[in-house]
Amino acid sequence: MNRAFSRKKDKTWMHTPEALSKHFIPYNAKFLGSTEVEQPKGTEVVRDAVRKLKFARHIKKSEGQKIPKVELQISIYGVKILEPKTKEVQHNCQLHRISFCADDKTDKRIFTFICKDSESNKHLCYVFDSEKCAEEITLTIGQAFDLAYRKFLESGGKDVETRKQIAGLQKRIQDLETENMELKNKVQDLENQLRITQVSAPPAGSMTPKSPSTDIFDMIPFSPISHQSSMPTRNGTQPPPVPSRSTEIKRDLFGAEPFDPFNCGAADFPPDIQSKLDEMQEGFKMGLTLEGTVFCLDPLDSRC
């Protein structure tokens, strides 16, 4: 029987939710390495990976090489693998990418987890050697996944929706900035044309045009028709035509479509952001297998 969350009755969590959600739990271990596996879950899968990396460790040990020590930082956001002294992050395994985690029952020092690589999308099995904390580290990763899973259920997917809204607004801002730059270039071109027209001298013997009348604010009354007809020409070329009114109805003062919060439609997200959101949701749906226990993204009261 699989439940949304279940664990063996003799296993209890040892950390407070605040420790994993607001901070992290550190552990020290030796890093045997990582190797690609064909499946995201399975005892046989990790057993073969452990055997392969143990053999590689013995070869390195016979050559005088030491197994590197690492620090693990476990939280609801994932498992970070750092160099203990410099704190340089070597690997950052996000929780929704971790699908299997177990400690070796035949070797109490060994624990392992399978994580999907963010760049290659291959499943990698990470193997560690911890003298006293192998089982505790495995349970801590399971607790972190459980807390992240419950946080997702409580939010009702609002976190994902919030990220989508932010992505949509960021795209809207980027589009407006692009439009603004294009409009600036158009204004600059019009100013250059106007400057060239103004500096051109009138033909010899021509009469000085009569100054138009002004209003009470000492300004020339605006008339689209008279303005267009009074625009001088140079070398027989006409100034750029004034856009018709029909093309301006759906544009604001700056040439952009007016923003309507009630008619903006569904956001069109950039492919990279959308794929990350879909991948995160799919990772939680797959769940985390912990010592034969499955955490899956189902309603809390469901039964499979």
UniProtKB/Swiss-Prot annotation:
Assembly and oligomerization: Homodimer. Interacts with clathrin. Interacts with GDP-bound ARF6, but not with GTP-bound ARF6. Part of a complex composed of GULP1, ACAP1 and ARF6. Interacts with ACAP1, LRP1, MEGF10 and STAB2.
Chain spans, region Disordered: 223-246
Modified residues (Phosphothreonine): 16
Biological process according to GO: apoptotic process; lipid transport; phagocytosis, engulfment
Predominant location: cytoplasm
Entry annotated with the keyword Cytoplasm: yes
Alphabetically ordered keywords of this record: Apoptosis, Coiled coil, Cytoplasm, Lipid transport, Phagocytosis, Phosphoprotein, Transport
Record InterPro entries: Adapter_Engulfment-Domain, PH-like_dom_sf, PTB/PI_dom
Source organism phylogeny: Eukaryota, Metazoa, Chordata, Craniata, Vertebrata
PROSITE patterns per record: PID (PS01179)
Domain of life: Eukaryota
Tissue and organ expression note: Widely expressed. Detected in macrophages, pancreas, kidney, skeletal muscle, heart, colon, intestine, lung, placenta and ovary.
Polar residues biased stretches: 225-237
Subcellular locations according to the entry: Cytoplasm
Name listed for the protein in its UniProt record: PTB domain-containing engulfment adapter protein 1
Coiled coil: 158-202
Signal peptide: none
General function of this protein: May function as an adapter protein. Required for efficient phagocytosis of apoptotic cells. Modulates cellular glycosphingolipid and cholesterol transport. May play a role in the internalization and endosomal trafficking of various LRP1 ligands, such as PSAP. Increases cellular levels of GTP-bound ARF6.
